[in-house]
Amino acid sequence: MKVLLTKEVKGLGKAGEIHEVKDGYGRNFLVGKGMAEIATNEVINRWKAEQKRRAEKEAQELERLKNVAKELASVTLKIVQKVGANGSLYGAITKEDLSAALMAQKGIEVDKKSFELKTPIKSTGIYEIEVKLGHGIHAELKIDVEGSNV
């Protein structure tokens, strides 16, 4: 019996591979536990179409992330925060603050987990922060932190 693996099966193969197995093993174990489907032409064609659709979606996402990285490289994000008498900020600027400011000022949505803050931003000045967008794509974001008196 030929089966198309839908999940990785130790000792047999990876998802998407077609293998010849004994009838009982294929029907009772692999198909019964949802690890494989009986490899008919319809199932194989459906699997290939699904893989093609996933690859196209992945390529679109990669292109979108590259465009976001280009936008971030050309953006200087301006954040105004309250400062005390000694010139330091009340509290630190967090990843959530950066994500919200980027969305509000530039309309670019970036997950707060993507920002790499090596040290907390607790004073005014210009900072460069690395943004890891996923799929190995990184961008540098300039942040201009200005203070406003209380």
From Swiss-Prot:
It comes from the Bacteria. Gene3D superfamilies: Ribosomal protein L9, C-terminal domain, Ribosomal protein L9, N-terminal domain. Signal peptide: none annotated. The keyword Plastid does not apply. Pfam families: Ribosomal_L9_C, Ribosomal_L9_N. One of its GO terms (biological process) is translation. GO terms for cellular component: ribonucleoprotein complex; ribosome. GO terms for molecular function: rRNA binding; structural constituent of ribosome. Keywords: Ribonucleoprotein, Ribosomal protein, RNA-binding, rRNA-binding. Binds to the 23S rRNA. Belongs to the bacterial ribosomal protein bL9 family. NCBIfam families: L9. This is Large ribosomal subunit protein bL9. It comes from Wolinella succinogenes (strain ATCC 29543 / DSM 1740 / CCUG 13145 / JCM 31913 / LMG 7466 / NCTC 11488 / FDC 602W). The gene is rplI.
